[in-house]
Amino acid sequence: MNSKRGMFTREYLWRSIVTMCGLFVIVITLGIGGFLVYKGSGTFLKFHHSIGEFLFSSDWAPVDNMEGGGKVGTLIFIVGSLSTCGLALLIATPFALGSAIFMTEIAPKFGEKFYRPVIQIFAGIPSVVYGWVGLTVLVPFIRDIFHRQVGHSILAAGLVLAIMIFPTITSVAADAIRAVPKDYRMGAYGMGSTRWQTIYKIVLPASASGIFSGIILGLARAFGEALAVAMVDRKSVV
C-alpha cells in the first residue's frame, strides 16, 4: 500500500513539474508576443500608418524621430522572404530526400558510419559561416555568370539557404524512413517488388508524415536565418 502511494506521489510530483515548465514556456511566449504587439502598435495608433500601407506597400523609408512619419511598407520584405525560402525548399528538398534514401536504403552501413556524422556536422555550422562562404564564393560566381555588376540576389540567398536547410531535412527524413517497420519491406520483397518499387510505393508513403515534418523544420530554419541572407541578398533580384 505504501509503495503504491509513493509511486502515486512521485508521478504526481513529476507531472506537476512538467506542467509548470509547459506553462512557463507558454507564459514567456505570450509575453514576447504581447511586448511586440505593444511596441509595434505605435506605428498604427501613434503615427497613423494604415495596415494596408504596412502590408501592401513597397516603400520603406521610416523617419527616426519622435514625430514618426516616413514610409513603412513591408511588401518587398515579405515577398523577398517568401521567394527566398521557396527557392531554397525547391532546391534542397529533392537532394535531401535523395540523400536520406541513400543513407537508409541504398548504403545503410556507409550512411550510418560516415554520411550521417557529416550531415550532423554541417547542421551545426553557424549561419555566419554559410553567409561568409556565400559572400566570398557564390556572389562573385553569380556576378560573373550572369554578367551583373553586383552578385547579391535572391538566387544567391536561395542557394545559401538551401545548403543550410539541407542537413535538417536530410536528418529528419532519414529518421522517418528508418522508422518504417522492416516487415513492410519484407512483405513487398515477398510479393516480387524490386528495391526501387519498395522504396517508392511502400517506404516513402509510410514515412511521408515524418518527411513533411523535416521539410517544415527546414522551412522554419530558412525563415529564421536572417544573417546569412542579409550577407548575400541586398534587395536585388536575378
Q: Which residues fall in each region the model found?
A:
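Cytoplasmic-entry segments and transmembrane alpha-helices of multi-pass inner-membrane transporters
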Residues: F95-G134, V172
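Membrane-embedded alpha-helices of multi-pass transport/permease systems
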Residues: G34, P94-S99, V118, A156, ...
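Transmembrane alpha-helices
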Residues: V172-A173, R195-D233
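Conserved small/polar residues in nucleotide/adenosyl-binding loops
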Residues: V237
